[in-house]
Each structure stands twice: as structure tokens, then as C-alpha cells.
Curated annotation (Swiss-Prot):
Organism: Arabidopsis thaliana (Mouse-ear cress)
Entry-linked Pfam families: F-box, Kelch_FKB95
Kelch repeats: 176-222
GO BP, one annotated term: ubiquitin-dependent protein catabolic process
Top-rank lineage group of the source organism: Eukaryota
Organism lineage string: Eukaryota, Viridiplantae, Streptophyta, Embryophyta, Tracheophyta
Annotated keywords: Kelch repeat
Keyword Kinase: no
Protein name in the entry: F-box/kelch-repeat protein At5g48990
Amino acid sequence: MSSPEKKRKKNQKSSPNPSLPEDLIVSILARVSRSYYTNLSVVSKTFRSILTSPELYKTRTLLGKPETFLYVCLRFPDEANPRWLILYRKPNQTLTKKKKKKEDSSVHLLAPIPILNSPTVEWSSLVAVGSYLYAITADIKDSPCSNVWYLDCRTHTWLDSPRLRLAHINSDFNGRTYFPGSSEKPDSLNCVEVYNTNTQTWNPVPPQKRKLKFGNMEGKIYIPPCQENHRKAVALNPKVLTWEAVGLGTNLDRGSFCMIGNIAYCYDPSGKFRWMNCNTAEGDWSRLEGLEGLPKFARYSTVKLAEYGGKLVVLWDKYVAASGYKEKMIWCAEISLEKRNSEEIWGKVEWFDAVLTVPKSYKFVCAKSATV
């Protein structure tokens, strides 16, 4: 072996493996889809630390790389805490034509995620504000909660907000979350409180601003009806802080309803998908047209709707005959929406997949999208 070759090999053995600067690693990881973060976190402690750091998500925002993910919460028998899952497209998978896809394995799946400090209490409403999901406990018939838990979707950790006096239902508008109270007197400061998600502070709505009236819903927050206590749907105008009764009916399951922009979508007990423009005073439901290729749901199916990057996501379950009807399969469909005129909205089924097998006794708690 020649002398130069010996020298080169000696230098290779003696030189330590150089590591990349941390800011460069952050810049690289910020360009990678978050769906790969779980696998990347086992590469090293450094990667694991960076993947949960605020700097990474700030960089993703600056690079225009935020992604929307659908979070699904399920309850299982004999488990105190709920399970959380994220809808993923399997790596290196592309959507295929429906006829061919039936012969292939699923392209999408609901993948479990570890959640730290998950509260054991159940909530009746969940609202997304950026990368946070705020959970409010119980319905109006139950005792009021005094604090609000929120899930940080970047670190998958539950945190506790500052305490408030009363909160039940909520909705997000311009970085603030509104919490109407229960049957308090109209002059009570506990009637409505506003939580500023940026400053994490509570402020009561002044009594003179709490008024009930009828009118159109332009630019207002919709609060779904509740079957159990016959509460009708209402809307809040955040600009002037006034309430309005809304004629949306009371026969809708909260999970079978969602808002996309100013349009309300629902799946009614008759098996129809409907929509309503909340900017009109009439408040009439219209049938969602199209939906070619979407399977018919069984009458027993649990059906949930959620907004997902401007599209409509539908989740439903179906018994698995091969299991002796001891299991159910959760299915998911993504539907793009096209408003053709003031009277018609058409839905196009982009894909549908079997995403998770569950025991028949499971409970579907909620589905909500967050941007991280």
C-alpha cells in the first residue's frame, strides 16, 4: 500500500464523525412532513428533542410548511383514559382508482399517538385554535367546569389553562374562544366569558352586551343544538357581543355536524347529507349533491363529520362479519366541496378507506383537525 493511501486511511480512522449544527438540523426537519416525525424521533436523543421544540414549529411556519392533521379521540371499555389517533397516509402510498383500490390494502390509517397527562373527564365540545385543541367538559345540565384543558398538538401534551368561573360550550374567532354559560341570571358576570388564547387570560362579557335577538348570521359563531336538554342552536356575533337564536333544529347529533367557513354541514337520521348557509336569514337546509362512490351507512353506524383543510371528512363504523360481529371497522372518506350557485353545493369523494378496527363496545368521542 502506498504512503499517501496509508495516510488517507489513518486520517479517516482518527477523524471523528462530524455532526451537523443544530440550526441546520432544524431547517432540514422543518421541511419534512410531520407524518415521519414518529419514526425520526427514535434516531437519536437530539432528533427527539428537536422534533418537540418550539423552534422547529416556528421554522415550519416561516417556511410555509404547516400541515393539517385530523385528530380522533376514542374510548374503549375498561380504559380510564381515552385514546388519541391521527389520520395518516401510509408512506410511499398514492391514491389509486376506486376499482383497483378495493383489491389493495388501505392507503390511510388511524395511527395511535402517545398523549401525556390526558384528562380522564369527558368533554362535549372541542375547538381548534392553531396547534391547540381546547376541550370543555360536559353539557349544560351538568355542573360547570372551572378550568379548560387544551392539547398541544406539537408535543402531544395536555395542559391546563388558567381557571375561570363558568364554561360549557365554545367556539373560536380571531384567536379568542367564547364560552356561554348555563342558566345563570342575565346580569351575572358568569354568563359568558372570553378566553384570549394568545394571552391565556379570561374576561367577562359586559352585561349590556349580552342580548338575545333574531336576525341573520353573517360573521357569527355557531353553537350546535343539544338534544338532551332541548337547547336550540344559537349564534354569537363577536364584534358586538350579541346572541341570536338560529333555526337549525334540535335533532342533530353534535358529532354529525361541522362548520366549514360560513357553511354548516350535517348528516341527518334519514341518511342524507345537508348544508346550510349561515349568512342567510332563512336558515334552510339543502341537500349536498354528488357524493358518487360514497358507501351507504348502516342505520346503527356512528357517523362523525369534521373540517379538514377546507374539505369535509366523514368517519363511520361498520360491523366486521368475520369477527363474529364482535368488532367494528372505522371508515373514513375525504370529500372536496364545490359551490356551483347559491342553491347548490356538490361533494366529490376524493377517497375512502378502512382506517381502524375496534371492539364493538368502543365509543367515538370526537374528531377535530389542527394545524401544526
